[in-house]
């Protein structure tokens, strides 16, 4: 798999279109950090890490709906393995005039664009969520 984070985002997108309550994805630290940001921003209910066997784990993602409609309207990968996208904090555009969130990988960890502006750090723009 060349883009594990992109795979997880696609699993979330597909599960929400199919109105699933839960989706699973292979576990990694980056994926868990991105899910933590999504949970803090209110886009998912939560997630848990399940150990399948020693050394192999998966993330169980609880999706969130509002009156039967998915909370996540759009989730797209920005920086890909073939085209990395980095942004200074002053050049980071707002997603849908502040209604959406960009998730960044910064030297201080994975955080939302709001947290990055507060901490005044830029980094790699992993994805956009609306």
From Swiss-Prot:
A Gene Ontology BP annotation from the UniProt entry: translation
Cited NCBIfam families: PRK00136.1
PROSITE patterns xref list: RIBOSOMAL_S8
Alphabetized GO MF terms: rRNA binding; structural constituent of ribosome
Naturally occurring in which organism (per UniProt): Acidiphilium cryptum (strain JF-5)
Any GO CC annotation of this UniProt entry: ribosome
Name the UniProt record assigns to this protein: Small ribosomal subunit protein uS8
Purpose: One of the primary rRNA binding proteins, it binds directly to 16S rRNA central domain where it helps coordinate assembly of the platform of the 30S subunit.
Homology family: Belongs to the universal ribosomal protein uS8 family.
A Pfam family the protein falls into: Ribosomal_S8
Keywords in alphabetical order: Ribonucleoprotein, Ribosomal protein, RNA-binding, rRNA-binding
Quaternary structure (record): Part of the 30S ribosomal subunit. Contacts proteins S5 and S12.
């Amino acid at each position: 798999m060349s883009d594990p984070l992109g795979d997880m985002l696609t699993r979330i997108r597909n599960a929400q279109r199919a109105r699933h309550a839960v989706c699973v994805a292979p576990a990694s630290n980056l994926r868990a950090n991105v899910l933590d940001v999504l949970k803090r921003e209110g886009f998912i209910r939560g997630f848990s890490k399940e150990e399948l066997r020693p050394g192999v784990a998966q993330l169980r993602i609880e999706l969130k709906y509002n009156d039967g409609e998915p909370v996540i309207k759009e989730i797209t990968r920005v920086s890909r393995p073939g085209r990395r996208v980095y942004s200074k904090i002053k050049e980071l555009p707002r997603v849908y005039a502040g209604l959406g969130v960009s998730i960044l990988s910064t030297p201080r960890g994975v955080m939302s664009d709001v947290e990055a502006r507060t901490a005044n750090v830029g980094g790699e723009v992993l994805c956009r969520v609306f």
